[in-house]
From Swiss-Prot:
Binding site for FAD: 10-15, 36-37, 58-61, 242, 390, 426-428
Upper classification of the organism: Bacteria, Bacillati, Actinomycetota, Actinomycetes, Mycobacteriales
GO MF annotation list: oxidoreductase activity; oxygen-dependent protoporphyrinogen oxidase activity
Pfam families reported for this sequence: Amino_oxidase (PF01593)
Cofactor note: Binds 1 FAD per subunit.
Cofactor(s) of this protein: FAD
Alphabetical list of Gene3D superfamilies matching this protein: FAD/NAD(P)-binding domain, protoporphyrinogen ix oxidase, domain 3, Protoporphyrinogen oxidase, mitochondrial, domain 2
InterPro entries listed in its UniProt record: Amino_oxidase, FAD/NAD-bd_sf, Protoporphyrinogen_oxidase, Zeta_carotene_desat/Oxidored
Protein's UniProt keywords contain Disulfide bond: no
Keyword Hydrolase tagged: no
Protein name: Coproporphyrinogen III oxidase
Localization of this protein: Cytoplasm
Leading EC class: oxidoreductase
UniProt-listed PANTHER family: PROTOPORPHYRINOGEN OXIDASE
Gene: cgoX
Length: 452
């Protein structure tokens, strides 16, 4: 039988994982071609050397309780490169001062008034305390915006000072743009099971306290993972953009190249997906157009190692506060300091407020310096700096997002699959999982064709 040919469009973590999983599934004889027009692979995973130390300037951590990343690292022989966070906790900047991250919450949604003490006023604390006694109606399967549910049950202060900072850090969005089932699926599930109030649902959803670290990273940065995936997938990398996809799986690139494939995986952002499948998969095209994304910018700094930052992993900024940054990560506190410099990064940009698109590098650096004075009272003299922009890289998981994704996938023809951060979660583990699902889909479709 003639060896099969596979094409993967997109060279980020989703595309590289898809290529690796394909190679695992189909063996050495098949041809796997990966299209990525950028001068590097990895997408929003980008490791650079700042102050002589490797630092991730895109995604920088993964949740350890999810199995995908530890399993993938083990397959690639990289388990010994996995790092765990030091245990330093983030703070919230609200009301012009720093507060501990509220305990016993799920994405900032409280399980009791005590978890919000010091962060919200007494009237809001009383409202949280009385929430369980107030009438509450929940429709099984519903997916409200987080802000709508939380503001109704607890008031605007809980949204602005507790929930928004966490969701802004994860999605570059807000409680108004993210649906409950994406942000807090365990809370939605508890409500579906019959929880009688939101505080009751949060208590049911709280994960058991393991005492262990929550986040992981890689010694040497995500580049270590990218190199491993490229090496093991043995792809043919075409540095060109695919501009047209035709049935029978003919791909045309921007140079005029024409490529034939038995199966295709589109590991591109939703807007590009919509353009590529227009005329091929109308349901998928329509669903993909419903998914919007935010842009962000990261300012990375290396400062002298003795700079007097507080002992925390960083700061999440409430949306109604004066700092321009949405989050500050004290990377050397979070992962442990190496060498004689301390590394930190400031993230800018929320959905609807996107300085990544408008501010100059000099403006972002000036904002970073001002924000460090405002939040920490520390004026820094960086020894190295870097600015990176991530344009439309943060999909917004709005209300009903899971239904949109289900429709998007249902409209795909056999032997065409999708992978990406807009599908099953924005984090790296979710991207790894979605890539595996895409590969399984096209392999099963090809096997079914042979069986017929």
């Amino acid at each position: 039988m003639t060896p099969r040919s596979y094409c993967v469009v997109g060279g980020g973590i989703s595309g590289l994982t898809s290529a690796y999983r394909l190679r695992q599934a189909v063996g050495d004889d098949a041809t796997i071609t990966l299209f990525e027009p950028a001068d590097r692979l990895g997408g929003v995973l980008r490791t650079e050397h700042i102050g002589g130390q490797p630092m991730d300037l895109g995604a920088e951590a993964f949740v350890l309780r999810r199995p995908e990343m530890p399993a993938l690292l083990a397959e690639l022989g990289l388990s010994d490169r996995q790092l765990a966070s030091t245990g330093a906790r983030p703070l919230i900047y609200s009301q012009q001062r720093l507060h501990p991250l509220p305990p016993q919450t799920v994405v900032g949604i409280p399980s009791s008034a005590g978890s919000m003490a010091g962060l919200v006023d007494d009237a809001t604390l009383a409202r949280i305390d009385a929430e369980a006694a107030r009438p509450f109606t929940w429709q099984v399967g519903s997916d409200p915006a987080v802000a709508d549910l939380v503001a109704d049950r607890f008031g605007d202060q809980v949204v602005a000072r507790s929930v928004d900072p966490l969701l802004s850090g994860v999605y570059a969005g807000s409680a108004a743009t993210i649906g409950l089932r994406a942000a807090a699926p365990s809370v939605a599930a508890a409500l579906d099971r019959g929880a009688t109030s939101v505080t009751d649902a949060v208590r049911q959803a709280l994960p058991p306290g393991s005492g262990g670290p929550v986040f992981g990273a890689l010694d040497g940065g995500y580049q270590v993972l990218l190199d491993g995936l490229v090496r093991r997938s043995r792809v043919h990398w075409v540095r060109a953009r695919v501009v047209q996809l035709e049935r029978g799986w003919v791909l045309r690139d921007e140079t005029g190249g024409r490529w034939q494939a038995d199966a295709v995986i589109l590991a591109v952002p939703a807007p590009r997906l919509a353009r590529l499948v227009d005329g091929i998969a109308p349901r998928t095209h329509a669903a993909a157009r419903q998914i919007v994304s935010a842009s962000s910018a990261v300012v990375a700094l290396a400062v002298p190692g003795g700079t007097a930052f507080p002992h925390c992993s960083g700061v999440l900024v409430a949306g109604d506060e004066s700092p321009h940054a949405k989050a500050i990560t004290l990377s050397s506190r979070k992962w442990g300091q190496r060498g004689d410099v301390a590394l930190l990064r400031l993230s800018f940009g929320r959905f609807g407020d996107e300085p990544a698109l408008t501010a100059s590098d000099d403006q972002l650096l000036a904002w970073a310096a001002d924000d460090l004075v405002t939040v920490f009272g520390v004026a820094v003299d960086p020894v190295d700096v870097r600015v990176r922009r991530w344009i439309e890289a943060m999909p917004q998981y709005g209300p009903g997002h899971a239904d949109v994704v289900a429709e998007l996938r249902a409209g795909l023809p056999p032997t065409l699959a999708v992978a990406g951060s807009y599908l099953d979660g924005i984090g790296v583990p979710a991207c790894v999982g979605a890539a595996g699902r895409a590969v399984t889909s096209v392999i099963e479709a090809l096997d079914a064709q042979v069986a017929r």
